[in-house]
Structures are given as C-alpha cells and as structure tokens.
C-alpha cells in the first residue's frame, strides 16, 4: 500500500556548513492538491530514543505510516506524512553532542523546510513518542521569540508515552538502580548537568533549564498555543521506562489552560514503552 504514494527518505532540511547527517526528513506525499474543499493536513512524526539513541530515528515510524496508508477515511484528510531526524546527545566522540535547545531547533528547521515546500502553514499535526513527545509539546509551549524563524504552531499534537517533567522522571526511577545511571546520563547529556539526588530539589542554573524545558512546567498554553484544536496524550500502564504519571499530571496542566474539549487522553494502551511504535495498531 505504501508504495502507491511517492516517498523520499533522508531529504536534507539544513543547507549550511553546520549541517549533519541528522538534518534529514523522510517524506511521503499523499495528496498535496489544494484544488478542492476537503481540509487536509500534514502529519509530522518526531521519534524518541531519549535524545541519544542512534538506533531510533525517523525510519522507526515506517510501520505506523504504512498502517495509516491503509485507512482511506484518514487518507482523505492527509496531504502528506513526514518523519523528522534531529541531532542527538550522549556521545560527543560519535558526533552526538547536541544540547537543549539544539534538538528543538532542528525540529523547527525541519517543519519550516516542509512548510516552505508544501505551504501547509498551521495545517499540520505533530505526533511524538517518548522524547519526541517532549519535543512536540515544546513547540506549543515555546514563546514566539527565538533566534530561529519559528513555524506556526500545529493545530494538533499527539504525545505517546511522553516525558513532560524531567526532574520528576529522574526522581520517579531513582530507586530502580539499573535505570538510575542511564537516566542521569541521558538527561544530563541532553539538558546539562545538575546535582540530582532522589527526593531533593535540584539547585543551580541547570535545574532551572530542566524546568524551562519541561512541558509540564509551562502554564501558559492558552496564550502560547492559541490555535490548538487537539492535545492528545496516550500512554500504557505497562510502560516500564516512563511512568504513567508523566502523562496524567501533564493532562491536568493542559486542561487548566486550554479550552474545554481540546485535551483528550487514552491511558489504556497495551504493551511496553516501545510497543507504541513496534506494534502500531493502538497508536494508529
């Protein structure tokens, strides 16, 4: 089914001496015609992987994309589907030395590139998994002041198994010894160092940056995301890597600042953290 629609992978979206192999986007064109009255949207996926895993990139969306391409009722409203790559953190020796807001800046560049090519303005939906869900909602929380041209905010965002409060995530898994060092490395690699310990309030500049980067710490979505039509959070209670409370508490934050009915939740998906994109039926 997917072969019926033109697909191009690894399309560069940054053209400068600072571009890397991560500055690419996979594109599948479904129906880019603007000649009829059917409202159509671009669907843009942001992968997870803890801002650092080189084995989890845009191509992990291919299964979900192929499932979507089987749904005629959905396709009637889709202009195209894209999956974004962005610079990673965690291992400078391998070129993975991005630090917040580098990941977010790359996502904005990719969306800006797609908009310049296809002209969808705010007619796009962002789907993010795990760290990709963080990035998706960072687009909505960010004020319209940036050193980069900021694309228009999406009409809808779907966050799957998302990380929305960085400090709370670390505290919630601190008692799990096998995850503790891994999570400290992941979060400090992406957002900067801090003197963290279970149950303590983080101190210093970096802790402030962690909070500034956490979608659950923002309280002004009503003004920063004025065109919001849907904010959907989905999560599995069986998620072994990101606690369900990340989504339940963030839902409360969103409901307090967005109009009634905009926030929708589904916290009954089955499976582990990565089953969301490895077994795409639920998310589709």
UniProtKB/Swiss-Prot annotation:
Residues at the active site: 130
Catalytic activities: N-formyl-L-kynurenine + H2O = L-kynurenine + formate + H(+)
E.C. code: 3.5.1.9
Gene3D superfamilies: alpha/beta hydrolase (3.40.50.1820)
Source domain of life: Eukaryota
Pathway: Secondary metabolite metabolism
GO MF term set: hydrolase activity
InterPro entries xref list: AB_hydrolase_fold, BD-FAE-like_dom, GDXG_lipolytic_enzyme
SUPFAM superfamilies reported for this sequence: alpha/beta-Hydrolases
Pfam families, per the entry: BD-FAE
Keywords linked to the UniProt accession: Hydrolase
Family named by the database record: Belongs to the kynurenine formamidase family.
Summary of the function given for this chain in its UniProt record: Kynurenine formamidase; part of the cluster that mediates the biosynthesis of a highly modified cyclo-arginine-tryptophan dipeptide (cRW). Within the pathway, avaC catalyzes the deformylation of the cyclo-Arg-formylkynurenine iketopiperazine (DKP), produced by the FAD-dependent monooxygenase avaB. The first step of the pathway is perfornmed by the arginine-containing cyclodipeptide synthase (RCPDS) avaA that acts as the scaffold-generating enzyme and is responsible for formation of the cyclo-Arg-Trp (cRW) diketopiperazine.
Protein known as: Kynurenine formamidase avaC
Organism: Aspergillus versicolor
Taxonomic lineage from the root: Eukaryota, Fungi, Dikarya, Ascomycota, Pezizomycotina
